[in-house]
Amino acid sequence: MILLENVKKIYKAKSGDVTAVDNANLKIDKGEIFGVIGYSGAGKSSLIRLFNQLEKPTSGQITIANRVISAITGSELRKARQEIGMIFQHFNLLWSRTVRENIEFPLEIAGVDKAARRKRVDELIHLVGLEGRGDAYPSQLSGGQKQRVGIARALANNPQVLLCDEATSALDPETTDQILDLLLDINKRLGLTIVLITHEMHVIRKICNRVAVMEKGKIVETGPVLDVFRNPQQDITKRFVQQLTDSEDTNETIESLIEKYPDGKVVRLQFIGEAVERPVLQRLMQRSDIEVSILQGNIAQTNNGSYGSLVVHLNGEETAIQQAIEGIHQDQVELEVIAHG
């Protein structure tokens, strides 16, 4: 569906060339929700703007739906852009137009007749949950409602691809989840390919099928979200995963608890997919002559399945503890010893 081959974007500056995107290679499948995550300055905003040619690549090739979009210009590019919708962090609405008129705007530009425009706007207002707000102006809307207008406007021309540029960064956590649920629903209903960029791992976890991690203009890691959670390869990816699995408060709590358990071993168990539902600790206590104390635990749901971790204290004879650890490995649960007694 979307293919990036050796794509590079270089900006000219007085201080010298700035490489915002450095030889990016990506393949995004039709109908998937693909996330790009990175900290500020990583190059993710420049990357997503290459998809619809708001930015032109310095080199490389971008193909969307079998069309080399990086090689077209003029009316052909304008037509191609109608098949690529985009929503923004700060909504980019026309403040002098109502909700209906904002959604209708791209249809006007495309030359759609008035009756067809009215019908399409009605459909979109229903799709994004803005019934009764069609005559309101942006200044009368909440942040979440403004983004719903942005989504409806982006879908007006029935695009194949929806680009989301930090679409939830200006929203509170509850509204963020509502917008993410809406995007997930639209993806399922319409079979729409969604590409989103964010600096929040929560967004990736909640709705993305796969993720690419960017750092200093380079794509340093890609993969299914659950695989990245389970086994992050790069230091930056590990930091993003720790946003959800290990907060500073959690680490401080574990450290203080470890001091209370000078004997035995403190281990971290990681559960992926079906392993989350296995009674691992129950089996452990049934077959081992050791004491098991749960110090901390959490479970996160990704779009590919569940991911969980437990920090537990194992106390008993060294031989019994080692046998227990071997039994945990047999249950296909990853284990890391984080403190020895």
UniProtKB/Swiss-Prot annotation:
Keyword flag Translocase: yes
E.C. no: 7.4.2.11
Binding of ATP, residues: G38, Y39, S40, G41, A42, G43, K44, S45
Entry's Gene Ontology molecular function annotations: ABC-type D-methionine transporter activity; ATP binding; ATP hydrolysis activity
Keywords of this entry: Amino-acid transport, ATP-binding, Cell membrane, Membrane, Nucleotide-binding, Translocase, Transport
SMART domains: AAA (SM00382), NIL (SM00930)
Subcellular localization(s) per the UniProt record: Cell membrane
InterPro entries recorded: AAA+_ATPase, ABC_transporter-like_ATP-bd, ABC_transporter-like_CS, ACT-like_dom_sf, MetN_ABC, MetN_ABC_transporter-like, NIL_domain, P-loop_NTPase
Catalyses which reaction(s): L-methionine(out) + ATP + H2O = L-methionine(in) + ADP + phosphate + H(+); D-methionine(out) + ATP + H2O = D-methionine(in) + ADP + phosphate + H(+)
GO cellular component, one term: plasma membrane
Transmembrane region(s): none
Origin: domain of life: Bacteria
Topology in membrane: Peripheral membrane protein
Domain ABC transporter, first and last residues per copy: 2-241
PANTHER family assigned to the protein according to its UniProt record, in alphabetical order: AMINO ACID IMPORT ATP-BINDING PROTEIN, METHIONINE IMPORT ATP-BINDING PROTEIN METN 2
Subunit record text: The complex is composed of two ATP-binding proteins (MetN), two transmembrane proteins (MetI) and a solute-binding protein (MetQ).
Recorded family membership: Belongs to the ABC transporter superfamily. Methionine importer (TC 3.A.1.24) family.
Function, as annotated: Part of the ABC transporter complex MetNIQ involved in methionine import. Responsible for energy coupling to the transport system.
Name used for this protein in its record: Methionine import ATP-binding protein MetN 2
Name of the coding gene: metN2
